[in-house]
From Swiss-Prot:
Record-linked CDD domains: TMPK
Domain of life (superkingdom): Bacteria
Function of the molecule: Phosphorylation of dTMP to form dTDP in both de novo and salvage pathways of dTTP synthesis.
Upper classification of the organism: Bacteria, Bacillati, Bacillota, Bacilli, Lactobacillales
Protein name stated in the entry: Thymidylate kinase
Class of this enzyme: transferase
One GO BP: dTTP biosynthetic process
Gene: tmk
Binding site for ATP: G10, P11, D12, G13, A14, G15, K16, T17
Source organism of this protein record: Lactobacillus delbrueckii subsp. bulgaricus (strain ATCC 11842 / DSM 20081 / BCRC 10696 / JCM 1002 / NBRC 13953 / NCIMB 11778 / NCTC 12712 / WDCM 00102 / Lb 14)
Entry-linked InterPro entries: P-loop_NTPase, Thymidylate_kin-like_dom, Thymidylate_kinase
Length: 212
């Protein structure tokens, strides 16, 4: 029995973590499968240690290729240890970020090339792709303003990047979304949280009606 794999993507400040948690609350009493919520970078013991290296604001000297490879290494461990076993059990896996983040942040934002970063991650994940990606669409400036309001002074290394970087990341996401219209569905994340959650729940239920 094969499971289902849903990823949530979007710029920093779009509210991915909050939305995922609210979506789970909304569907867990109705879903016929176990639900596993996870995140990237991280999701497993080794992957979380790599996460700490990647996001540590002190690591300002980290070059773009190192950053991309660390994300891929974390993802490889996450997939083999957490995601694939859950999918084999038949679970519904919901991940806060996945490969699309690397394509947008390192491929476009860091200028490494989306295709090049895609190749690295295809190797790292064994070509695993989500069944559905919900992209929480938010203007980068608005996202950074949200972060500053909530976590002022405690932003991670990527959140501390200037607006120009985050705008480039957003352009990367747009390219990825346009290349995968069947997989990626867009939700306006500038709406109030209940509206964003409702739209996300609707997408999950309409994409996988057999789960409910």
């Amino acid at each position: 029995m094969q499971g289902y794999f849903i990823t949530f993507e979007g710029p920093d400040g779009a509210g991915k973590t909050t939305v995922i948690n609210e979506v789970v609350k909304a569907i867990q009493g109705q879903c016929k499968r176990e639900i596993l919520v996870t995140r990237e970078p991280g999701g497993s013991k080794i992957a979380e240690k790599i996460r700490d290296i990647i996001l540590d604001p002190a690591n300002t000297e980290m070059n773009a290729k190192t950053e991309a490879l660390l994300y891929a290494a974390s993802r490889s461990q996450h997939v083999s240890e957490i995601i694939n076993p859950a999918l084999k059990r038949g679970d519904l896996v919901m991940s806060d970020r996945f490969v699309d983040s690397s394509l947008a942040y390192q491929g476009q934002g860091r200028g490494l090339g989306i295709d090049e970063v895609a190749q690295i991650n295809a190797f790292a994940t064994g070509h695993l792709e989500p069944d559905l990606t919900i992209f929480l669409d938010l203007d980068p400036a608005q996202g950074l303003a949200r972060i500053a309001k909530v976590r002022s002074g405690s932003e991670d290394r990527l959140e501390q990047e200037k607006l120009a970087f985050h705008e480039e990341v957003y352009r990367g996401y747009q390219k990825v979304n346009q290349a995968h219209p069947d997989r990626v569905k867009v939700v306006d994340a500038s709406q109030d949280l209940p509206q964003v959650v409702a739209a996300s729940v609707k997408l999950v239920k309409s994409t996988f009606p057999e789960l409910f």
